[in-house]
Amino acid sequence: MSGLPILVEASGLRVLVVGGGAVATRKAKQFTQAGAVVRLVAPTLDEELEQLVLARGLAVERRPYESTDIGDAQLIVAATDDRIVNAGIARDADAGSRLLNAADHSDDGNFAMMAVHRRGPLTMGVSAGGVPAAAVRIRDVLAERFDARYGDALSDLCALRKRMIAAGEVHRWREKSPELIDAEFCDAIERGQLSARIAEWP
């Protein structure tokens, strides 16, 4: 799948996850943690997914998928162990112009979920052409470098930007911020110097 990476505000997003196994559990967790309103459809749920349902109060339809289940869902995850069912979900999602993640056959969907690394305001996503294990491996390598130092420094940088905007200094921020975000930016973070530079910034 070739596509355009975007960062979506998931809070309140209406998500339908069809399936009750390990993949459905992982997807439901990701969306729930992001603040989405997750609804499940599956005859049975894995124990871990049952626990998530109880902990988060997720809505569940304990039966096979039906076309009407799409309802008002804005985003759909097809994660059953039945290729025919997943293909049917894909057709229904396409007919309803909904976003679909097809867990077993990515080409049936119109969006894919990346292997994600987060540190404070920093979010990095990795896609590897439909090979999730490769994406995870690359993500883990990146995570070793882009550690808590980056999260802390970027938190300070974001706070500075917000303060300047609140003070009506948008133009000054745009003019002066390249002095902080220069060719030595990453080196300064890794040496623990960026936060000090921010604190001293006029």
Question: What is the predicted role of each segment?
Answer:
Residues 42, 60-64, 104:
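Short loop/edge segments at beta-strand edges and connector loops
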Residues 35-39, 73-83, 121-130, 144:
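Short beta-strand and adjoining strand-loop segment in the mid-core
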Residues 1-44, 49-53:
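Hydrophobic, well-ordered beta-alpha structural blocks that scaffold small-molecule cofactor pockets
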Residues 12, 71-73:
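Alpha-helix C-terminal capping/helix-to-coil transition sites in glycosyltransferase folds
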Residues 51-71:
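Glycine-rich, highly charged phosphate/nucleotide-binding loops
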Residues 129-202:
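An accessory alpha-helical subdomain
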Residues 99-151:
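E1/E1-like adenylate-forming module used to activate ubiquitin-like modifiers
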Residues 75-81, 86-112:
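ADP-ribose/adenylate-binding Rossmann-like module
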